[in-house]
């Protein structure tokens, strides 16, 4: 169920990485046309009290990009980047980051601490292995259907 915060956040990260990560067609096209740089980042916080997901980026076209991202999020279930093939790629990417992070005690300590529920960082390989596109879509619906989208634009001085 959705009570398992860690698994939920991993599946949500997979969905948003498919749509907005560097392997997505959307990111590639915005990057190639100079509308986005590599500063695009994704932050997810899922716990028993509140959930949030934050996309941050530098762009010269905040209104257009914001509109495009909002539409993509609303129509995530039919997004061309949300596919079995792309999910397999993202799963490998998440697993690679996991293996890499095992070299960092600090990372393990902070990650281990932030999820005191049933699963931990060490369950990640199993979560990745068992993750299906249907699971990802289900979590996506649960999160997006129950969320408000808020935009902040910070202009340089």
Language model: regions and residue ranges:
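His/Glu-based metal-binding/catalytic segments typifying zinc-dependent metallopeptidases
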Residues: 1-25
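Bilobed periplasmic-binding protein-like "clamshell/Venus-flytrap" ligand-binding domains
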Residues: 137-140, 145-153
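M16 family metallopeptidases and their MPP-like homologs
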Residues: 1-2, 27-78, 85-130, 148-156
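Generic, well-ordered alpha-helical scaffold segments in large soluble proteins
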Residues: 18, 72, 139-142
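Short Gly/charged-rich anion-binding patches and loops
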Residues: 25-26, 138
């Amino acid at each position: 169920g959705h009570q398992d915060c860690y698994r939920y956040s991993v599946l949500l990260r997979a969905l948003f990485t498919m749509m907005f990560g560097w392997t997505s067609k959307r990111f590639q096209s915005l990057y190639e046309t100079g509308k986005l740089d590599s500063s695009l980042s994704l932050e997810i916080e899922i716990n028993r009290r509140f959930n949030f997901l934050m996309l941050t980026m530098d762009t010269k076209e905040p209104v257009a990009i914001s509109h495009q991202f909002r539409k993509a999020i609303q129509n995530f279930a039919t997004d061309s980047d949300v596919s079995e093939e792309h999910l397999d790629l993202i799963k490998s990417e998440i697993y690679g980051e996991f293996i890499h992070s095992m070299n960092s005690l600090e990372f393990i300590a902070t990650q281990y601490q932030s999820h005191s529920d049933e699963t931990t960082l060490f369950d990640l390989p199993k979560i990745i292995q068992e993750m299906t596109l249907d699971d990802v879509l289900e979590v996506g619906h649960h999160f997006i259907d129950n969320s408000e989208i808020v935009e902040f634009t910070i202009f340089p001085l």
